[in-house]
Amino acid sequence: MADISSLNAFFNPASVAVIGASSDPSKAGHTALQNLLSMGYRGKVYPVNPREESILGLRCYRSLLDIPEPVELCVLLVAAGLTLRVAGEIAERKRRHGDVAAAVCMSAGFGELNTPEAKE
């Protein structure tokens, strides 16, 4: 059985990639990024969005695979239809760099749609 230190990546990560970060204040990707920056998080923060150059003063990366420094926690704030692709990027990053220790998926549009595709 794992000990409590295995949860450090969730509760005290050295770095966080916010996948689906947004410059639009009405989007969850903006709120999550803003909260990390305004509530005293001291680690490195990497916004990820292929359509943005920078968000809230931080350089934005097109993909998780483009971040040149270690990433410990990934926070997914993408549409349900993109989640599997992003999960594949996380697996590929872990294979290449061995650095992603945890991920949190806060995407909407799965089972609550009550469609076979969403439930899959």
Give the location of each predicted region.
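Catalytic-core regions of core metabolic enzymes
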Residues: 1-120
